Amino acid sequence: MLRALKTHVEAPIVVATRAASTNAEKLEEIRERLAKGPNFQDFVQNPDNTRSEWEQYDGKLRREKGEEQRLRLPPWLKTTIPVGKNYAKIKAQMRELKLSTVCEEARCPNIGECWGGGEHGTQTATIMLMGDTCTRGCRFCSVKTARKPPPLDVNEPVNTATAIASWGLDYIVLTSVDRDDLPDGGSKHIAETVREIKARNSNIFVECLVPDFRGNLECVETIANSGLDVYAHNIETVEKLTPYVRDRRAHYRQTLQVLTEAKRFNPNLITKSSIMLGLGETDEEIENTLKDLREAGVDCVTLGQYMQPTNKHLKVIEYVTPEKFKHWEERGNELGFLYTASGPLVRSSYKAGEFFITSILENRKKRQNATEVPKEQ
């Protein structure tokens, strides 16, 4: 009788345990599907807008001093949902290899366009190395911050290179969080990743968008001589606004020095920087920043609209019009930049390969035409 009672009591427990195990497995499966699938931003569909709609927009574009209300998003800053096989493939592999991309962490509006291939089919992705947590707290950036982030993943350089080789990308941008907690700021980790990528595909263009390493020139030299093609470091904003926009450890003149020294360590490098507009800067300050970058030997510059990622970040002071961005593109070309990418949705890594390759091909064609000797009649 006792044996029968014991069996009667244990049976429901076994059934309950199996049911709980099955439910846990189903829950884990759902979580995995959600992680790999589209997120909320993927479903926020915005209509395509024509230039005529932009020109007819009469909404307020500048927030006056003392105003707290956020500006309404103008039509030229609305984008369509990211779709396509390339986009889905890259996103799925990012999840599998536990890699981070600044495209997602920084909520870039161009993710579908870059991952999908863009106008000329040049696929570009931007991978964020050294984790998803930064030691700095810039007031414009949505990346997580902490004084001491988790340790580096020693397998990341190989995992990153393996993923990139399987994607068949033409151009890859490696960026990273700041790691002031590490003696070398993570410079050796970044350099190793570049070497692993080039070992698998020597033809791929590699751009590194790197921190300032608090002005440590040994770290700058490590990156400059790692085998990369483009050394990028963003100045972000004009000199006057730098203390309010960037982390207190970032300095305007320090950024210029990093860019100057990178070129000195490796004269064959292309150097690049980026400026956000809409934070309250004046035209004169933008002009001076562009000139400072040229004096530092910077070859390429991008200008884009600052967009407030959350309510905790800096508010947008002004939405700059596409016409104004066009002006700065023309001005950048006049100042002698190899290329200037300027537009409301342009980001430092926006279609980097497409802009870069197109510009290089155009310049080569111009040089070829200029050196051709006319045939005798």
UniProtKB/Swiss-Prot annotation:
Keyword match Cytoplasm: no
Pathway(s) of this molecule: Protein modification; protein lipoylation via endogenous pathway; protein N(6)-(lipoyl)lysine from octanoyl-[acyl-carrier-protein]: step 2/2
Record GO cellular component, one term: mitochondrion
Entry cofactors: [4Fe-4S] cluster
One Pfam family matching this protein: LIAS_N
Alphabetized UniProt keyword annotations: 4Fe-4S, Iron, Iron-sulfur, Metal-binding, Mitochondrion, S-adenosyl-L-methionine, Transferase
Keyword match Hydrolase: no
NCBIfam families assigned to the protein according to its UniProt record, in alphabetical order: lipA (TIGR00510), PRK05481.1 (NF004019), PRK12928.1 (NF009544)
Name of this protein: Lipoyl synthase, mitochondrial
Gene: Las
